[in-house]
């Protein structure tokens, strides 16, 4: 009995091992040619079973690690292979159900489709399940029985369609102009891309029957056999966006695609006429992408560029050239046939109605790229499109009607397209090339002294002189070691800093001025001119200063009778009134405000480098002799009419502040900026009127 039990043990053990192999596939059968640890070949067991292999044997064949296990091996936590079906599923008889297992996605990928994360799938994720040619050929696409799918005349034409997330129906648009349209749903915001289709899909694309009038057909219903029921583009296909994933420092493919899609949407947000994104099918202002077919080849494409030209996203040279081209008379041809000519009675194929679309603004663009309003019609032309060029291109492309619609944006006026030419150059290198001489601060300080003596009384002139005398030794100490090159460099620093501040002044809605340390106005904002009536050219010395408003506390020339002072300057440099020269800050404030300013300036000039002063003042309005006579004649009547019409609610109302006495009471804050030599370089002042 014991002998029989021993003989039965190997068979039972082998049966258990065979069952384990069938269930888990963990055990392996060694090669008979391989040797054991003692150098002897494996000998078959008495019952015909091979002995198990030694896992520590260095000559044991190593199994290649699979990129992704199948579902069965993943569930059993077993080693799988790259082939499908894998060897373990074949042994277990599960070769028909051997598919790649689904990995647990990260939190930021929870909304990503499973197929988009599978390696090697690419753009075939959606198209592989929706490219049944027999279904497309037999699919009726007719709303009222007028249109059907013609499989014989479909080789060079494509279909334009839109996904609508609100319902399960899709609008399919034919290539011919559509006479009537009924768009009831709004498409989601989608980026621009090329719709890659295989030859089977291109051969079986949609077209309208030549004898039937072109109408809008619809494909509806969540039919699983509907080839359009799936998604219309694959976000995991990098060819759709034409950017290299390997060049992006992303460990995840889907994250790189998401980053590229956001950049692609940002570059296509400006709905400009000749923008290459528009030619490829730019984002519509109603939040939907514009599908179009190339008239050159007739092949389907999502806004493909002409002549098989590959679209591009980053470094697009056409993104910023269209304002200059339009202003110079160059016409930009509509590549995808997006906008039809006005008067043809047709609507835009593949474009939804804009009546329900919100207003949009172009991202990171100037006023030249202002987005059109939702009520404007894209069929209208701006009046400066070159139709002759459009006709010539249309004839060269073999179009029957000989007309090519042009992309036009009616809300962009022709005058606004020429604004860019008047803007200053964005390259500050011209500053370093133009400054050749140091600024004559000595002469300017003498001019300031003469201006103060002409306007203020001797008592207030003495107060200002004491304040300036307190900082005079500091100026001498900081400038005595500077040579001519240092002074030229100082002026370059000033001009470069002023060049930077001009952008801030234009972007800020607060009345702002920038002065030199002498008090001369160097930059001024539009709001300050509106508030005080001082024109920018007058403040900068480009036009004569004809102001006679000095606040009324002292008469002009009252300070010049007490002493005979002749300012030092070059020949012909006169301080006579009316000579075009920059206006001093002392001419913009009333007497008390000027004295208070210079007392604060004496404490702040060489004191706290980051300090500022916040106080109140009274600005003097710009008034000529004619303005003073007019104000005295109908002062009360104009002021009462102004208050009756709504106060200071508009630009004209702000200009009327201080109309009665010629002074505008303001609260202002100012600070001193120093240069590299720690010398006061400029004074930045912000004003707010006290209402």
Swiss-Prot record:
Compositional bias ranges of the Polar residues kind: 179-223, 273-297
Region (Disordered): 1-63, 179-228, 269-310, 549-579
Superkingdom, natural source: Eukaryota
InterPro entries named among the record's database cross-references: ERT1_acuK_gluconeogen_tf, PAS_13, Zn2-C6_fun-type_DNA-bd_sf, Zn2Cys6_DnaBD
Classification via Gene3D superfamilies: Zn(2)-C6 fungal-type DNA-binding domain (4.10.240.10)
Basic and acidic residues: bias regions: 26-43
Gene Ontology process terms (BP): cellular response to starvation; gluconeogenesis; positive regulation of metabolic process
Keyword Transcription (UniProt): yes
DNA-binding region: 70-98
MF-aspect GO terms: DNA-binding transcription factor activity, RNA polymerase II-specific; RNA polymerase II transcription regulatory region sequence-specific DNA binding; zinc ion binding
Annotated PROSITE patterns: ZN2_CY6_FUNGAL_2 (PS50048)
Endpoints of the signal sequence: none
GO cellular component: nucleus
Function in brief: Transcription factor which regulates nonfermentable carbon utilization. Activator of gluconeogenetic genes.
PANTHER family: TRANSCRIPTION ACTIVATOR OF GLUCONEOGENESIS ERT1 (PTHR47659:SF1), ZN(II)2CYS6 TRANSCRIPTION FACTOR (EUROFUNG)-RELATED (PTHR47659)
Protein name: Transcription activator of gluconeogenesis acuK
Species this protein is from: Aspergillus terreus (strain NIH 2624 / FGSC A1156)
